[in-house]
């Protein structure tokens, strides 16, 4: 699920392996306000109301990273896209690519 906003970009990923009973979720957010920050959240997800949501309504982990002031918005978006691409290489699928 890619949601674009004027001040924030957000992409959600899931990795599902029913044979191993593994349902993982991962969310990456880029806040474009000063200071620019990239927040990642991860944890187990379950399917509710047609979408994947965090199990027990909470994420298992969260990491927030402030980007240096000398980076402009384009550099921040590049770092954000690199993180998203790493998730895709590890087998995570974008919410929007799933068929319900």
Task: Give each language-model segment a name.
Residues 1-39:
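Short N-terminal "domain-start" leader segments
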Residues 10, 19-20, 48, 66-67, ...:
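Intrinsically disordered, low-complexity regions of eukaryotic proteins
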Residues 39-51:
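Short, solvent-exposed aromatic-acidic interface loops
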Residues 43-45, 62-65, 83:
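Short beta-rich binding modules
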Residues 51-75, 90:
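A short, exposed loop/beta-hairpin motif centered on an aromatic-Gly-Thr core
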Residues 81-96:
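Short arginine-rich
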């Amino acid at each position: 699920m890619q949601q674009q906003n004027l001040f924030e970009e957000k992409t959600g990923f899931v990795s599902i392996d029913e044979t191993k009973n593994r349902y993982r979720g991962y969310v990456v957010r880029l806040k474009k306000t000063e200071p620019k920050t990239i927040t990642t959240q991860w944890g187990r997800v379950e399917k509710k109301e047609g979408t994947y949501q965090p199990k027990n309504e909470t994420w298992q982990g969260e990491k927030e990273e402030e980007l240096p002031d000398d980076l402009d918005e384009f550099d921040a978006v590049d770092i954000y896209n690199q993180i998203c691409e790493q998730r895709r290489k590890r087998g995570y699928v974008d919410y929007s690519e799933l068929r319900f």
